[in-house]
Amino acid sequence: FNTFINDGSTEAFNKGEFKETSFFGDPNSSFMVKYTFGEKMDGLFNTPDVIQQDNLGIAAYMKPAQMLTALRDVVLGKERFDAAFAEYIRRWAFKHPTPWDFFHTMENVSGEDLSWFWRAWVLNTWKLDQTVKAVAYVDEKPEKGVEITIENLEKMVMPVAVLVKESNGKEHKINLPVEIWQRGAEWRFNVPTTSEIKEVILDP
């Protein structure tokens, strides 16, 4: 938790007066992907003496902090995450909690089943790779809207934020919940566009 809390406290202290560039920088950078989701990365559930030396800093600090940031910003939202995190601290202060105690508290207070999240981030070394597979106009006419197909290429699943830009300047922001992946690796949805599509962006 140390890196995650440090990053948040630096941003919040004195209304951000001394805020520095986030520890994470650009979360989509090749550096983050290479070390957090690399082929040789160890699982977070391994004990430190089992984790490879080159991966220890990532497994102990960077990936857990990145995981908690994703849980707060993408999955639960700041309000629910902060309430659940505060309750975890209240329940387990001066005690000896296990990772399962943290998992259960976050789920209990937030009211969400997060088993899919822990399975991907903690219990396994799965990767996240989502893509736009197809874009097709309804009846082949741009003014009738568009059907977009997205695909999850790896085992990790996450909610999807989509930005659709039209040639006429209009933009559509769609937030799809993680449950869309329960029925398979592809999901189709329609957007009521009225002109040709300029761009479709995931996680804008």
Language-model features: where?
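Hydrophobic alpha-helical and helix-loop surface patches within well-folded domains
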Residues: 1-151, 200
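Beta-strand-rich binding/interaction modules
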Residues: 128-131, 135-203
